[in-house]
Each structure stands twice: as structure tokens, then as C-alpha cells.
Amino acid sequence: MTTAQHITTLCFWQLRYTLYNPSLILTSIFCCHDCVTDDVSPNRLLLKTSNTHIVLIPCYNPGAKVLNTVRAVRKEWSPVWVIVDGSTDNSTALLLAEAAQDSGLKVLVQTRNGGKGSAVLYGMTEALLQGYTHALTVDADGQHPAPLIPTLMARSEAEPASLILGKPVFDASAPALRVNGRKVSNGWANLETLWVGLGDSLYGFRVYPMRELQTVMLNNRWMRRFDFDPEAAVRLCWAGLKPVNIDAPVQYFSTEEGGVSHFKYGRDNLLLTWMHIRLMLGFVLQLPRLIRQRLQQDRA
């Protein structure tokens, strides 16, 4: 017997039973309604909407695969906001159509491309105005594991003053050059934070306390493009936030699978190099304070 047939049979016998028990008619009606609703409605309709924690998905020309990402995220959390960062493909129309039939999804549009950090700042500023306090950032390309969203959010709710970081676990689909290359950047980031415990500075699947992140971003002109994730992690650690690492599997998609990458090895590695030069200068200037802060954290 199929699941649908099983549910139909249960509802039939429940209804027959209530004919001899009039007081249970209302209960029976709700039971049948729940059977039908659970069978045909997406899980996202059963989610409780958070008043404090929101998911932000910045995207730039992500292709049609962004809908798969958004739907996977919506199954795990509400609300979800997508920030379109000057996209020129047809994904914006697809996202707006999706949001029109999903009250838990909102699409914000920046007409000019400003970079991932710029998109996150735009969405975060609006979210703060609406009373949200924390944001989990998810890449639009589907590499981040949506089923782990409740885990990261729960940890953030338990430790609201911490920076909750996804720590990537790579499989065979991950390009070796990128996996090995990030070790260099992570080494510098850990030095710049006196090895406070950054599991991975480049992985963008993380929960930010938004007020602290907004303050950091408004106090400098950088962190707007590919340098956003690592510089945000370092500067928030400088601000005293404790990093908490949670293992998260990463999946890379080929072009044939709809994967889209805007990473440019030359341009973005130069950007990261310049970022670490700036951060090392800041690290040296702040070293006495950072040492005191680290000692206090170790004693806590």
C-alpha cells in the first residue's frame, strides 16, 4: 500500500468512527485536513518564523540553480531573504516569481553589482531596521548544506555573542587548487587573530551578529567583494567575538550540473593578498590589545 493510500484509509476509518461519536466530528475534520495538508504542502509551511534570526542569500548571475538553493533553504528556515546584486541574467525574474507565492521569502534588488559584502550589508541593514539581530549567510550556488541551517541557528541562539562558523568538509568534487590555496589564507587569518580558533576564514556559511558586523563594515571601505568573508571573520574576532566552528560538508557542482563560479584566480588572489597586508598592519598596531584580549578569553 502506498503512503497516499495508507493516509486515505486512516482518514476513512476516522470519519466512519466519528459518525457514531458526534462530539468528535470537529476533531475528525481537522485530522483529515492535516492528512491532506501534510501530503501536498511543502515542509516550509510548517516552519515557525524566527523574529531574530534570518537567512541572507546574496546572489549575482547565479543561473536557474538558485531556485533549488532557495527552496532547500526555505525547507529549513523562515524568513529567507535573497539579495540580488546587480544580476543581468534571468534569475531575478525567477526569484521574484518565487517570492510572490511564498510569504517566507523576500527578494531585495541592488541594480548595480557591488560584490558579496555589499549585498550582505544592504540586506543586513534592512533586516536590522525590521528588528532582526542575527543573519546566516548562504551562497546561492548550492554548495552550502541547507539541512545544517537549524543547527547553526540553534547554536547562535544559545550563544548570541559568538560568531558561528561553518567549517568546510570537502569531498572529491572540490578543486584541489582551491582546497590547498585556502590553507595559506587560513594560516594568515589565524596569525592575525592570535590563533583564537578560526576553523576556516573563507567559508561563507556562518551566522553573524548583525549589529557588530554592520559596525565593522561601516568603519572601513573594504570587505565588499571576495575579501568579505575572511576580513569579516578576522575583524569580528578583533572586536571580541568568540568563533564557534561546526563541520559542514561542501559540494561543488560542474557546469553541466548548473554550477556557476565567479571566482577569478588572479584577481581574487590579488585581492586576498592586499587584504592580508592591510590586516597584518592592523594586527601589529593592535597587538598589545589583542594579547590582553586573548589572555582574558583564555582565562574565561
Which residues does each predicted region cover?
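Hydrophobic helical membrane-anchoring modules
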Residues: 38-50, 219-300
